[in-house]
Amino acid sequence: MIYLLSFACTTLNNANADIITLRIHNHSCLSIFIHVILYPETEKIITMIDNYGRKIDYMRISVIELCNLRCRYCMPEDGIAKRPHEEMLTFEEIVSAAEAAVSLGVRKIRITGGEPLVKRGIIGLCSSISAIDGVEELCMTTNGTLLPQYAKQLKEAGVDRLNISLDTLDPGKFSYITRTGSLQDVLDGIEAASVAGFENTKINTVLMGGFNDDEIADFVALTKDRPLEIRFIELMPIGGGIGFDRARFISCEEVLKKVPELEPLGFSDGVASIYRLPGAAGRVGLIRPVSCEFCESCNKIRLTADGMLKPCLHSDTEISVRGRSREEMAEIMKEAILGKPEMRSALDADNPSQAGRDMNMIGG
């Protein structure tokens, strides 16, 4: 058992913050570093540092496994059965988990699914999470089809930013890859997000050879006049969705070959390397989970809709927080952070992810 030590600071003669670094050992001789930053007037900020020096300040929370689309790389063709309510986290448990994470230093929370906007009560849930003291950024990843209905409400509920999944600009190919749905619904959703006041919306585009590699330039062109960020993401060999093979895999380097005028901005945004067309209003992000693993900078943990805490996306290690109090959840999260591996295993056609779930059951 690991105990988070608490220090009270009643007076400080120096206006600058003091930083106390604690190293706490558990019975396995593993250790976790906890930075306690003490400010005047007893303000206290906790930062969790794992065994490999990574600051864990980001949590992805999947609130539902169900989706109104059936994307081939995310979900089995026949979809998934709706599970009994008692097997899933309750509204209150999701909020408690967010509170526990924030108490340990998480500052950014992302709501995912499935499709989070099909969850009953999603607006109230977002409002409750955004109201937690310490949440600096609340984001949501959505397929965008329901944003015409919900974008304004999400903004009012405190959601700061949206990522919208869109893998093709061709209506026929959209119908194929999603097995249902309408491209126009997503385009309307992107517009609704803009009207609602969301800025710097990110479009997540999974690169797939033989499917959308001929649309790379078209996606990049969307950034010329609009402040969007197109995020090209390498297809990962995960779950039982679309087959991953060498022909299907497209490295992000292909984007730079097809659009050589893209200029690097010299910095990264999380896991994305950022580029821009000269004079463009928006920008392009390249995310390389396969060709260039970024484990050394991993700052996140994941919580599935059925209450399983995943220290690593590509590991089948999971710890349940369902039915636990907020305090118990916090203890479990500390153990999960200690359990984060230094590196994931290899990812390629011969070495699929060890995640143990389809992406819709993890949170995309």
Give residue ranges: language-model regions:
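Canonical Radical SAM [4Fe-4S] cluster-binding loop centered on the CxxxCxxC motif
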Residues: 51-89, 313
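Radical SAM/AdoMet-radical enzyme domain recognition
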Residues: 88-111, 118-233
